[in-house]
């Protein structure tokens, strides 16, 4: 039976009880002791009435009336108990109704809370989904195409690459980056994929890095090959493979870098048991300067002669060259060489392999080490300007080598911001792969300062930054 039906039934009982009480009270009133004559009154009535009523019968009648009165009182008492029971039941019912009301209210509130929680959960889920999409979007923007499925595993490619320069702190930087918990380990620092082993394929390259089974625990992946910056083939290859990878470039005072490379090459020859270097630093510097000048001059004259020949052929002429553009030096650069850009830098690689440019050829190229390039690798503007044909400047983080010695914490902190990884304590900083050598003599030092001056000024203007090198 429902609560409402119970309430209606109790109300009917109460109404009925009131009616019964009224009737009984009326009967009680008419049969109450004051309504019946006492024995003295009856005796007096008998004596005065003269009708001669039987006194015993009157007493019996009075007893019967008293018995009825007692019975009525008992019934009234029972009725009183019944009314109390009814009131108690009514109170209990009311309490039950109140409890049910409160329970219903609590249920409603709980349901509202559940709905709110559900909505909040939905909102949270939606927010998490949005955040997840944003993370995926951000990840796809910063680190796209870095993982490929191969034989049930994910082989991941670098998110960042240290592209140069040689003898400018790349070993130090790679050592401390490998200590960061958010950066994956690689098999070796210099992989040389984009300049020397590109034909081995992308799977060969990917196997040099830490492998993953899912993207959930993926770390940043990087490598450091300082010879990438000075190879004209590297930039287009890297752009084709990892066009959104973050690039890191370390630059050192070009005078000091050139000398450091020379002494490093001597040690390298000893370690590899190669023939010793028979030329002094000064001799190699002047010879390389002649190669660069001859190659560039020959290339410029060849371009001018080529334009003249095309113009003469267009006008129906015989295509003869002017006297001032003829000569053997046009063969210094292969005329069928495919240009990556109009920058002279792209021709340097062919120049250093040309015996006609340099009477003793590429001195250490035949012994397996590219020592040649002490000057060219220090012409930073020419190299960076070429790379900007493929990568925007904001994608390249440039570190001044001299800052590594004076403020290594600041250098790594700025790099962590660039890579979007947490700041950590690297502990004590120690120099890495430092080559000790005697100081440079003043004459060759002055020559190099003057030689690099124009390139340095172009670099400062390009980056809007003064590196405060020797001038």
Swiss-Prot record:
<feature type="compositionally biased region" description="Low complexity">
    <location>
        <begin position="112"/>
        <end position="127"/>
    </location>
</feature>
<feature type="binding site">
    <location>
        <position position="252"/>
    </location>
    <ligand>
        <name>3'-phosphoadenylyl sulfate</name>
    </ligand>
</feature>
<dbReference type="GO" id="GO:0008146">
    <property type="term" value="F:sulfotransferase activity"/>
</dbReference>
<feature type="binding site">
    <location>
        <position position="348"/>
    </location>
    <ligand>
        <name>3'-phosphoadenylyl sulfate</name>
    </ligand>
</feature>
<keyword id="KW-0808">Transferase</keyword>
<protein>
    <recommendedName>
        <fullName>Membrane-associated sulfotransferase kil1</fullName>
        <ecNumber>2.8.2.-</ecNumber>
    </recommendedName>
</protein>
<keyword id="KW-0735">Signal-anchor</keyword>
<keyword id="KW-1133">Transmembrane helix</keyword>
<feature type="binding site">
    <location>
        <position position="260"/>
    </location>
    <ligand>
        <name>3'-phosphoadenylyl sulfate</name>
    </ligand>
</feature>
<dbReference type="InterPro" id="IPR027417">
    <property type="entry name" value="P-loop_NTPase"/>
</dbReference>
<dbReference type="GO" id="GO:0050829">
    <property type="term" value="P:defense response to Gram-negative bacterium"/>
</dbReference>
<feature type="region of interest" description="Disordered">
    <location>
        <begin position="89"/>
        <end position="127"/>
    </location>
</feature>
<dbReference type="InterPro" id="IPR000863">
    <property type="entry name" value="Sulfotransferase_dom"/>
</dbReference>
<feature type="binding site">
    <location>
        <begin position="167"/>
        <end position="172"/>
    </location>
    <ligand>
        <name>3'-phosphoadenylyl sulfate</name>
    </ligand>
</feature>
<comment type="similarity">
    <text>Belongs to the sulfotransferase 1 family.</text>
</comment>
<dbReference type="GO" id="GO:0042742">
    <property type="term" value="P:defense response to bacterium"/>
</dbReference>
<dbReference type="GO" id="GO:0005794">
    <property type="term" value="C:Golgi apparatus"/>
</dbReference>
<feature type="glycosylation site" description="N-linked (GlcNAc...) asparagine">
    <location>
        <position position="324"/>
    </location>
</feature>
<feature type="compositionally biased region" description="Low complexity">
    <location>
        <begin position="89"/>
        <end position="105"/>
    </location>
</feature>
<feature type="topological domain" description="Lumenal">
    <location>
        <begin position="34"/>
        <end position="471"/>
    </location>
</feature>
<keyword id="KW-0325">Glycoprotein</keyword>
<feature type="glycosylation site" description="N-linked (GlcNAc...) asparagine">
    <location>
        <position position="344"/>
    </location>
</feature>
<keyword id="KW-0472">Membrane</keyword>
<feature type="glycosylation site" description="N-linked (GlcNAc...) asparagine">
    <location>
        <position position="47"/>
    </location>
</feature>
<comment type="function">
    <text>Sulfotransferase involved in intracellular killing of bacteria.</text>
</comment>
<dbReference type="GO" id="GO:0140460">
    <property type="term" value="P:response to Gram-negative bacterium"/>
</dbReference>
<feature type="topological domain" description="Cytoplasmic">
    <location>
        <begin position="1"/>
        <end position="12"/>
    </location>
</feature>
<dbReference type="Pfam" id="PF00685">
    <property type="entry name" value="Sulfotransfer_1"/>
</dbReference>
<dbReference type="GO" id="GO:0001878">
    <property type="term" value="P:response to yeast"/>
</dbReference>
<dbReference type="InterPro" id="IPR037359">
    <property type="entry name" value="NST/OST"/>
</dbReference>
<dbReference type="GO" id="GO:0016020">
    <property type="term" value="C:membrane"/>
</dbReference>
<keyword id="KW-0812">Transmembrane</keyword>
<feature type="transmembrane region" description="Helical; Signal-anchor for type II membrane protein">
    <location>
        <begin position="13"/>
        <end position="33"/>
    </location>
</feature>
């Amino acid at each position: 039976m429902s609560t409402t039906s119970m309430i209606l039934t109790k109300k009917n009982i109460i109404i009925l009880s009131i009616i019964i009480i009224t009737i009984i009270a009326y009967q009680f009133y008419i049969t109450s002791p004051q309504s019946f004559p006492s024995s003295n009154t009856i005796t007096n009535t008998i004596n005065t009435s003269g009708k001669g009523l039987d006194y015993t019968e009157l007493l019996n009648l009075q007893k019967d009336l008293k018995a009825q009165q007692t019975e009525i009182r008992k019934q009234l008492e029972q009725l009183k108990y019944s009314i109390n029971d009814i009131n108690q039941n009514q109170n209990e019912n009311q309490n039950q109704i109140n409890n049910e009301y409160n329970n219903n209210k609590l249920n409603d509130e709980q349901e509202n809370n559940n709905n709110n929680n559900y909505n909040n959960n939905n909102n949270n889920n939606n927010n998490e989904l949005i955040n997840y999409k944003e993370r995926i979007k951000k990840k796809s923007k910063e680190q796209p195409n870095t993982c490929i499925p191969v034989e049930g595993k994910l082989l991941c490619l670098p998110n960042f690459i240290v592209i140069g320069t040689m003898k400018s702190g790349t070993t130090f930087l790679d050592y401390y980056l490998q200590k960061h918990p958010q950066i994956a380990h690689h098999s070796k620092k210099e992989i040389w994929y984009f300049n020397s082993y590109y034909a081995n394929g992308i799977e060969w390259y990917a196997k040099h890095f830490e492998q993953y089974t899912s993207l959930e625990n993926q770390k940043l992946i990087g490598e450091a090959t300082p010879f990438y910056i000075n190879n004209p083939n590297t930039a287009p290859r890297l752009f084709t493979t990892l066009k959104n990878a973050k690039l890191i470039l370390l630059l050192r005072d070009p005078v000091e870098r050139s000398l450091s490379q020379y002494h490093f090459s001597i040690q390298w020859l000893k370690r590899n048991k190669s023939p010793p270097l028979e030329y002094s630093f000064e001799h190699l510097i002047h010879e390389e300067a002649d190669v660069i000048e001859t190659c560039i001059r020959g290339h410029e004259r060849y371009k001018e002669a080529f334009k003249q020949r095309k113009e003469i052929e267009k006008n129906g002429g015989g295509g003869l060259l002017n006297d001032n553009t003829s000569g053997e030096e046009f063969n210094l650069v292969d005329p069928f060489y495919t240009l990556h850009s109009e920058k002279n830098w792209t021709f340097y690689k062919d120049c250093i392999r040309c015996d006609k440019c340099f009477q003793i050829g590429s001195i250490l190229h035949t012994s397996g080490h590219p020592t040649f390039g002490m000057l060219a690798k220090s012409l930073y503007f020419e190299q960076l300007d070429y790379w900007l044909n493929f990568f925007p400047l904001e994608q390249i983080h440039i570190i001044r080598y001299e800052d590594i010695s004076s403020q290594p914490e600041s250098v790594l902190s700025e790099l962590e911001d660039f890579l979007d990884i947490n700041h950590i304590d690297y502990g004590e900083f120690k120099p890495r792969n430092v080559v000790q050598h005697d100081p440079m003599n003043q004459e060759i030092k002055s020559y190099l300062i003057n030689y690099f001056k124009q390139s340095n000024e172009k670099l400062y203007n390009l980056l809007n930054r003064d590196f405060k090198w020797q001038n």
